[in-house]
């Protein structure tokens, strides 16, 4: 190769490099959901013999919307919903939201009173009463189904919405019991959850007023694997409640 050809080749490579550097890169994938003013997360303990630790956010704008209560799974606690940004997001969207530590988890002491189904129902009723929660939507993942399902069966008149996320304890109730519950329900589960999600979905489908959202490429804790998709589905459900 002559010096002239080598020079032309070098010039061509330089021009290609400069052109490449000037091209715009791929757009950053940022979420619009969490933007806005900062939100203060309050903490406290309920009254009574079984004191329950909770985290709470108030709506940044005064609304008359539903109030959302978050339970949690076996490996989690109320802090999960703060870390995920769920509490803060709902506050910005005009919702009051409360996340509780179930007995024996997080900052709540163990309690013998929740060893029975009736005791677990009474505990949730006490939380709603102590915190003066009304028009409540109950969000129940995994293990917390042992609290949420008996509460739904016995006290569904206290709920304006129910969001089960592959909960336990669905087998404890007959098809007719589910059919008697008219509470609007959003059934959420992860596509990759091949055990509890399928089992619970079989039973929860008997609820007469339900919709189903499957989060793709998400496992049992689908809200952790696909938080933005989870938040979008939850907000769409809440925003359309009467």
Swiss-Prot record:
The keyword Nucleotide-binding does not apply. Keywords: Cytoplasm, Glycoprotein, Hydrolase, Membrane, Signal-anchor, Transmembrane, Transmembrane helix. Its main location: cytoplasm. It is found in: Cytoplasm; Membrane. It is an enzyme of class 3 (hydrolase). Its EC number is 3.-.-.-. The active site is at residues 142, 193, 220. InterPro entries: AB_hydrolase_1, AB_hydrolase_fold. The keyword Iron does not apply. The chain crosses the membrane at residues 6-26. Glycans are attached at residue 38. Possible role in granule neuron development. Belongs to the AB hydrolase superfamily. ABHD14 family. This is Protein ABHD14A. The lineage of its organism: Eukaryota, Metazoa, Chordata, Craniata, Vertebrata. The gene is Abhd14a.
């Amino acid at each position: 190769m002559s010096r002239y050809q080598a020079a032309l080749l070098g010039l061509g490579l330089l021009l290609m490099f400069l052109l490449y550097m000037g091209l715009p890169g791929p757009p950053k994938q940022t979420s619009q959901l969490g933007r806005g003013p900062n939100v203060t997360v309050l903490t406290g303990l309920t009254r009574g013999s079984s004191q329950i630790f909770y985290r709470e956010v108030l709506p940044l704008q005064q609304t008359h919307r539903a109030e959302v209560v978050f339970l949690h799974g076996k490996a989690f606690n109320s802090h999960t919903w703060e870390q995920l940004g769920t509490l803060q997001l709902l506050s910005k969207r005009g919702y009051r939201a409360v996340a509780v530590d179930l007995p024996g988890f997080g900052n709540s002491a163990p309690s013998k009173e929740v060893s029975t189904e009736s005791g677990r129902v009474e505990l949730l009723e006490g939380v709603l009463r102590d915190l003066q929660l009304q028009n409540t939507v109950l969000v129940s993942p995994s293990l917390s189904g042992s609290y949420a399902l008996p509460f739904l069966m016995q006290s569904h008149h206290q709920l304006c919405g129910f969001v089960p996320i592959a909960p336990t304890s669905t087998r404890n109730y007959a098809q007719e019991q589910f059919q008697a519950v008219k509470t609007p329900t959003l059934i959420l589960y992860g596509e990759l959850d091949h055990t509890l999600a399928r089992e619970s979905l079989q039973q929860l489908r008997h609820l007469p007023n339900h919709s189903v959202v499957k989060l793709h490429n998400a496992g049992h804790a689908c809200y952790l694997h696909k938080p933005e998709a989870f938040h979008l589905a939850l907000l769409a459900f809440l925003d359309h409640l009467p």
